[in-house]
């Protein structure tokens, strides 16, 4: 039997009918803050408000619902960093199927607990591997040994068709408001979302520029399509944007993206953190890192989108509150507002007061101070964190620190040392 490897608008239309009474029609909202910031009209497609707080339910339910009754009776499996797993769990409960869900051990606890909540007694969760790709290998082995049905998170035409229903829904909403999009920004992990969306947009909104957004530490689609012209596996990835940190995209999604995506943007993980905080404080939107990717890319395109109409897909809102400290730290590092140094500190009374008076600026704040006293030496080692009010103050701060201790170590430039602090 020939395996289907292409997706058509007809496939998406059929998926739309299957999902009509299953998924929530999420809002398409004009965002006044972003529109004012970038001097254009910015709409947000709020998939963070979906039943499982991400678009993944669309693809998971569609892929599972097309299985035969015999296949369904054998049970289903999947591998996921979180959101696809929640979609599969929700579907397993809805259709009363047995599911074994494999998740990386690095998956935020919030996502693991949500999978168990949505699936209840229909779902068994297995935590294995440090990355999605390691987790995937375990899931495929288990699926083969137990003759179950693997529900691919992105490299499956039914999954892609399900994700594509988001585009159909979005264009119908835009049409009712007499809106035409000049640009669409959407996150890329394995490529299922961008493949489904771009397939529908190229037929029904061909003048819309499709921009795929990846974290700079896991830009597997860009490296495959643009740099190598073939699917490649990244040897190392930054797992921070966990919903979009995939070392290897799908063969099917690669071909669709290569044909449909107009451009790719790589966004620094620190910029994503700044966007998460900005969206929460300015718009009261709780976005996970992958969910904030599309909005993060607007800064790269601010000259292109001026006066245009733009839509960003907020793909997910499953953020673990326990990660907020790290998110704030990464944002401050990216914005050049917080800086860490290792200093040799004089071991005499009044040394700290001298440091505060001579080194700190009037608006600088000490956020970390760890002192290791050495009884046999004249100096002790200090790790100090300083937060600025303005990143332009950094040059003068460094000059004062160098005068205080010419042998100081600036930790921000040393990824290994910095990783020990957050």
Curated annotation (Swiss-Prot):
Per the UniProt entry, what species is this protein from, by scientific name? Staphylococcus aureus (strain MRSA252)
Which EC numbers does the record give?
4.3.1.19
This protein's UniProt keywords = Amino-acid biosynthesis, Branched-chain amino acid biosynthesis, Isoleucine biosynthesis, Lyase, Pyridoxal phosphate
Q: Where is the signal peptide?
A: none
Quaternary structure, per UniProt, is: Homotetramer.
- Residues that the record marks as modified (N6-(pyridoxal phosphate)lysine) are 56
Q: What does this protein do?
A: Catalyzes the anaerobic formation of alpha-ketobutyrate and ammonia from threonine in a two-step reaction. The first step involved a dehydration of threonine and a production of enamine intermediates (aminocrotonate), which tautomerizes to its imine form (iminobutyrate). Both intermediates are unstable and short-lived. The second step is the nonenzymatic hydrolysis of the enamine/imine intermediates to form 2-ketobutyrate and free ammonia. In the low water environment of the cell, the second step is accelerated by RidA.
Tell me its family: Belongs to the serine/threonine dehydratase family.
What is the name attached to this protein's record?
A: L-threonine dehydratase biosynthetic IlvA
Q: Which residues bind pyridoxal 5'-phosphate?
A: 83, 189-193, 315
Q: Pfam families from the entry? A: PALP, Thr_dehydrat_C
- Which reaction does this chain catalyze? L-threonine = 2-oxobutanoate + NH4(+)
Reported cofactor(s): pyridoxal 5'-phosphate
What gene makes this protein? ilvA
Recorded hits in PROSITE patterns, A to Z, give: ACT_LIKE, DEHYDRATASE_SER_THR
Pathway listed for it is: Amino-acid biosynthesis; L-isoleucine biosynthesis; 2-oxobutanoate from L-threonine: step 1/1
Q: Which GO terms describe its biological process?
A: isoleucine biosynthetic process; L-serine catabolic process; threonine catabolic process; threonine metabolic process
ACT-like domain segment(s): 339-413
Any one GO molecular-function label of the UniProt entry: threonine deaminase activity
């Amino acid at each position: 039997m020939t395996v289907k490897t292409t997706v058509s608008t007809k496939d998406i239309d059929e998926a739309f009918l299957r999902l009509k009474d299953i998924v929530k029609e999420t809002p398409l909202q004009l965002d006044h803050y972003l529109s004012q910031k970038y001097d254009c009209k910015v709409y947000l497609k709020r998939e963070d408000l979906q039943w499982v707080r991400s678009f993944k339910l669309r693809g998971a339910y569609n892929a599972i619902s097309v299985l035969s009754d015999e296949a369904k009776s054998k049970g289903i499996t999947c591998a996921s960093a979180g959101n696809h797993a929640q979609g599969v769990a929700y579907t397993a409960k809805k259709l009363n199927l047995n599911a074994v869900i494999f998740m990386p051990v690095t998956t935020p606890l919030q996502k693991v607990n949500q999978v168990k909540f949505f699936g209840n007694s229909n779902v068994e969760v297995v935590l294995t591997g440090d990355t999605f790709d390691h987790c995937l290998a375990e899931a495929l082995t288990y699926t083969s040994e137990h003759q179950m049905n693997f529900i691919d998170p992105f490299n499956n035409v039914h999954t892609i068709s399900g994700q594509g229903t988001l585009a159909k829904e979005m264009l119908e909403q835009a049409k009712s408001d007499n809106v035409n999009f000049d640009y669409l920004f959407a996150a890329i992990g394995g490529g299922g979302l961008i493949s489904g969306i771009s397939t529908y947009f190229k037929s029904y909104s061909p003048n819309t520029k499709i921009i795929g957004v990846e974290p700079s530490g896991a830009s597997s689609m860009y490296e495959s399509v643009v740099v190598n012209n073939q699917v490649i596996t990244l040897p190392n990835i930054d797992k921070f944007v966990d919903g979009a940190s995939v070392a290897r995209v799908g063969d099917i999604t690669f071909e669709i993206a290569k044909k449909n995506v107009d451009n790719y943007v790589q966004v620094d993980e620190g910029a994503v953190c700044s966007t998460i905080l900005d969206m929460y404080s300015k718009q009261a939107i709780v976005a996970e890192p992958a969910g904030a990717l599309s909005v993060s890319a607007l800064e790269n395109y601010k000259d292109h989108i001026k006066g245009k109409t733009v839509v960003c897909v907020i793909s997910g809102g499953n953020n673990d509150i326990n990660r907020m400290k790290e998110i704030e730290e990464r944002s401050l590092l990216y914005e050049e507002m917080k800086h860490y140094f290792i200093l040799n500190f004089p071991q005499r009374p009044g040394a700290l007061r001298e440091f505060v008076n001579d080194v700190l600026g009037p608006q600088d704040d000490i956020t970390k101070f760890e002192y290791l006293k050495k009884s046999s030496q004249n100096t002790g080692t200090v790790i100090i964190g300083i937060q600025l009010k303005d990143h332009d103050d950094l040059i003068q701060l460094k000059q004062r620190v160098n005068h205080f201790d010419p042998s100081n170590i600036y930790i921000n430039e040393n990824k290994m040392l910095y990783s020990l602090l957050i």
